[in-house]
Amino acid sequence: KKGKKNMASSLMHYAITDKILQLFPMHDGARLRFGAVLPDASVNKRKTHFRVYSEKLGIRLYDLEAYRAQFGKRMQKDDLYLGYYLHLIEDALYRKTLYDTFGWNPYTPESTARMHHDYTLLNRHFIQKYNIRDDLAVPENFTQEPIFAFEPFDAEGLLRSIHQNFVPAPADAPY
């Protein structure tokens, strides 16, 4: 699965955002949730995740300052843009934990395949444990949003992919 080998699953972003909304109600929770999964709705993940290469460190980093420079004012007024920013922070923390704390190597096919299998198992667990609803929707007039001009996201495709997590597993599935 090209482009998803080192990020938390979209459903995990949804679950985290749902929990945040329970603790800190926002003006528009639906837009916050949608924004929190939006960076994964593109094949150009480096661009949508504001990833830049650091010569000094020899790795790609999340350029949160670039996101704030481009969308910071909107982020203060529009929960979609705040949700998008939350996604970037979650991914940065996830990578730091996975790589630095646990020493995970994303460059082997075995570890990537194992992680995607784990996502499948965890996604179903999160749906049940946190009572996650299959209610994400593309906001009205989304294609008119400045963020859509930044990258023409395949939001409908992402929602179809997330929806697949809610389809019951076959009876013979191990989990």
State where each predicted segment sits.
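N-terminal leader/auxiliary helical segments
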Residues: 2-175
